[in-house]
Amino acid sequence: MAHKKGVGSSKNGRESESKRLGVKVYGGEMAKAGNILVRQRGTVHHPGENVGIGKDHTLYALKSGVVVFTRKKNDRSYVSIKTES
């Protein structure tokens, strides 16, 4: 028999923090060079004109302009920046 009462611990408290993924600047909105446009896991959206891609697949603006989302024949979503020129 146990001589000490077992001390239980909570079975909760393991929830991982949300990673705040998703579109940060939507189509038709202005974006400055360097702005993060989309945070994602894998290439859900692909980089188009004037958009760069980071090592964690984050899409960011290379130039300032208006954000444009397009879907091409291969059914991929592309994010581009339309500059004022």
From Swiss-Prot:
The UniProt annotation puts the region (Disordered) at: 1-21
- UniProt xrefs under Pfam families: Ribosomal_L27
* Keywords, ordered alphabetically: Ribonucleoprotein, Ribosomal protein
Keyword Ribosomal protein carried by entry = yes
Name the source's superkingdom. Bacteria
UniProt xrefs under SUPFAM superfamilies: Ribosomal L27 protein-like
GO CC annotation, single: cytosolic large ribosomal subunit
The keyword Ribonucleoprotein is assigned to this record:
yes
Please list the GO biological process terms of this entry: translation
Single GO term (MF): structural constituent of ribosome
UniProt cross-references to InterPro entries, sorted A to Z: Ribosomal_bL27, Ribosomal_bL27_CS
Family as reported in the entry's similarity comment: Belongs to the bacterial ribosomal protein bL27 family.
Its name, as the record gives it, is Large ribosomal subunit protein bL27
> Which source organism does the UniProt entry give?
Porphyromonas gingivalis (strain ATCC BAA-308 / W83)
